[in-house]
Amino acid sequence: MRPLIVASLPIKKIEDLKLIENFLDADLIELRLDYLREREVSLISDYYEFLDKYKKKLIVTLRDKGEGGINQLADELKIKILNELYERQYLYDIEVSFLQKYDIPYDNRIVSVHYFNYLPTLEKIKEIVSKFSEKAFSVKIAVPSLKGYKEVLLPLLEYENVTVIPMSNNSLERIAVGLLGSKLVYSYAIEPLAQGQLYYKKVIQIFNYINDITTSSLVT
């Protein structure tokens, strides 16, 4: 079973939400709302009627700056929007660090943690996965390509709904973890938003090609 292909779309002005229609061939489209200033983020409710048409395709992300976000949002605004999204049954990405501070619902949502400057221990990551994986849609773990990072990431693929992201310039590593069991593979819709991201259509093409090879080998 192939992973779900996510096309990450930076929303740099509120009107960029209209671009969603260009990427519906991806399994999921991540709307990176942290590219907006607070004033524009607060206008998101004006677009719910439009977004509702596509919500089964969407991941809404308000990434904290400390975890790779672009613009920091006030916690109060983020809480308000996340609660609205939950009520409207949208899939969103919420950081472990935010859940530790606030009582935000995360059932059937993406719970994430991003490490940039150091490599956590496997035991620490397993603790996070064990805590959130039963209720979450996926627990997403992103780590830098420091010495020993593969030994941290690969054992996590034994879990059913874990997404692992090697923050490496080697794009093939993202494909590899998808083949080995990562629930989601992140790619870009317009421009790379992180190290190693490939264009989403290319990622779809790669996995379709691998699927064709696997299927034909089973037939023969």
Swiss-Prot record:
Where, by residue number, does 3-dehydroquinate bind? 8, 30-32, 63, 174, 197
Q: Name one GO biological process term.
A: aromatic amino acid family biosynthetic process
Protein name listed in UniProt: 3-dehydroquinate dehydratase
- What biological function has been recorded for the protein in this entry? Involved in the third step of the chorismate pathway, which leads to the biosynthesis of aromatic amino acids. Catalyzes the cis-dehydration of 3-dehydroquinate (DHQ) and introduces the first double bond of the aromatic ring to yield 3-dehydroshikimate.
Subunit text: Homodimer.
Looking up CDD domains in the UniProt record yields: DHQase_I
From the UniProt record, list the reaction(s) this protein catalyses: 3-dehydroquinate = 3-dehydroshikimate + H2O
* Gene Ontology molecular function: any one: 3-dehydroquinate dehydratase activity
- So what EC number does this one have? 4.2.1.10
Q: Does the keyword Lyase apply?
A: yes
Question: Mind listing the UniProt keywords for this protein, alphabetically?
Answer: Amino-acid biosynthesis, Aromatic amino acid biosynthesis, Lyase, Schiff base
InterPro entries in alphabetical order: Aldolase_TIM, DHquinase_I, Type-I_3-dehydroquinase
Could you tell me which Pfam families the record lists for this protein? DHquinase_I (PF01487)
Q: Which residues form the active site?
A: 114 (proton donor/acceptor), 140 (schiff-base intermediate with substrate)
Database matches in NCBIfam families: PRK13576.1
Cysteine pairs bridged by disulfides in the record: none
- Pathway(s) of this molecule: Metabolic intermediate biosynthesis; chorismate biosynthesis; chorismate from D-erythrose 4-phosphate and phosphoenolpyruvate: step 3/7
The family assignment reads: Belongs to the type-I 3-dehydroquinase family.
Look up keyword Amino-acid biosynthesis and say if it applies. yes
Q: What class of enzyme is it?
A: lyase
